[in-house]
From Swiss-Prot:
EC supergroup of this enzyme: transferase
GO MF annotation terms: rRNA (pseudouridine-N3-)-methyltransferase activity
EC number: 2.1.1.177
Source organism (scientific name): Lactococcus lactis subsp. cremoris (strain SK11)
Keywords assigned by UniProt, alphabetized: Cytoplasm, Methyltransferase, rRNA processing, S-adenosyl-L-methionine, Transferase
Subunit structure, as described in the record: Homodimer.
Designated name of the protein: Ribosomal RNA large subunit methyltransferase H
Source organism phylogeny: Bacteria, Bacillati, Bacillota, Bacilli, Lactobacillales
Positions that bind S-adenosyl-L-methionine: L76, G108, F127, G128, R129, M130, T131, L132
Membership in a protein family: Belongs to the RNA methyltransferase RlmH family.
Database matches in Pfam families: SPOUT_MTase
Gene3D superfamilies assigned to the protein according to its UniProt record, in alphabetical order: 3.40.1280.10
Length: 159
């Protein structure tokens, strides 16, 4: 099994790239992490609700094209389930032991995720009700994936 992180938008800030690279390096071959960046749709100024939904659908189609049949899909959503690091570790462990494909985490674009992505998801995770920049959220998620692996291996990293 591999863990994939499918994200809408490019990472621009060097300090975030460096932080993510550090955690990816630490994971090494334990449970490889692949990050797939998808181009975000350009949102016109004063976009109508219909235009915004069409953009979300296009981004959703791009996301779903990266998900395979046996993959376990976890999406980040404000209204999702609040989880502790231990609960996330348990989810990762179960996907590793019982899964038939890869474990895929998704961070959508600034408009959110399409209904189709929500319907395909196996788990909706919330990191709280606060709004965070998607680029920062990527670093936080990668750290939590690393932490989950350390918990599952009994490492002292998680105290």
């Amino acid at each position: 099994m591999k863990i994939k992180l499918v994200v809408v938008g490019k990472l621009k800030e060097k300090y975030l790239k460096d932080g993510i690279a550090e955690y990816v390096k630490r994971m090494g071959t334990m449970l490889p992490l692949e990050i797939i960046e998808l181009a975000d749709e350009k949102i016109p100024d004063n976009a109508s609700e219909k235009e915004a939904e069409a953009l979300k659908k296009r981004e959703g189609d791009k996301i779903l094209s990266r998900i395979q049949t046996g993959d376990k899909l976890a999406i980040l959503a404000i209204q999702g389930k609040l989880m502790s690091s231990e609960e996330l570790a348990d989810f990762v462990k179960k996907a590793e032991v019982y899964g038939t494909g890869n474990l895929v985490f998704v961070i959508g674009g600034s408009l959110g995720l399409s209904d189709e992505v929500y319907k395909r998801s196996d788990l909706q995770i919330s990191f709280g009700r606060m709004t965070l920049p998607h680029q920062l959220m990527r670093l936080v998620l990668v750290e939590q994936i690393y932490r989950a692996q350390m918990i599952n291996r009994g490492s002292a990293y998680h105290k």
